[in-house]
Amino acid sequence: MNIRPLHDRIVVRRIEEETKTAGGILLPGSAQEKPSQGEVLATGNGQIRDNGETRALDVKTGDKVLFGQYAGQTVKVDGEELLIMKESDVLGVLEG
């Protein structure tokens, strides 16, 4: 099943982060924070402005993005946990 987000929303798959500290200590599941970066799987058509025009989104499918720990709404699609969030929830795009 595919999701087509509406307007200025994007679908993101979380990218799992390291479960080990820099000193080599393994963190238990209860001490780990939710990953705050992910890959954009789909984007909406853009933000609808007050004058009715649509502004294209800055993020594109395939971008690796950073977002706040509590950003977006979690949904399950075909057994996979995804996030749907507004583009404004994205803090930045990882490049390189």
From Swiss-Prot:
Molecular function in Gene Ontology: ATP binding; metal ion binding; protein folding chaperone; protein-folding chaperone binding; unfolded protein binding
Subcellular location(s) of the protein: Cytoplasm
Keyword Cytoplasm in annotation: yes
Top-level taxon: Bacteria
SMART domains per UniProt: Cpn10
Region annotated Disordered, chain positions: 26-48
UniProt KW Chaperone keyword: yes
GO biological process, one term: chaperone cofactor-dependent protein refolding
NCBIfam families: PRK00364.1-2, PRK00364.1-5, PRK00364.2-2, PRK00364.2-4
Function: Together with the chaperonin GroEL, plays an essential role in assisting protein folding. The GroEL-GroES system forms a nano-cage that allows encapsulation of the non-native substrate proteins and provides a physical environment optimized to promote and accelerate protein folding. GroES binds to the apical surface of the GroEL ring, thereby capping the opening of the GroEL channel.
Subunit structure: Heptamer of 7 subunits arranged in a ring. Interacts with the chaperonin GroEL.
Protein name: Co-chaperonin GroES
Gene for this chain: groES
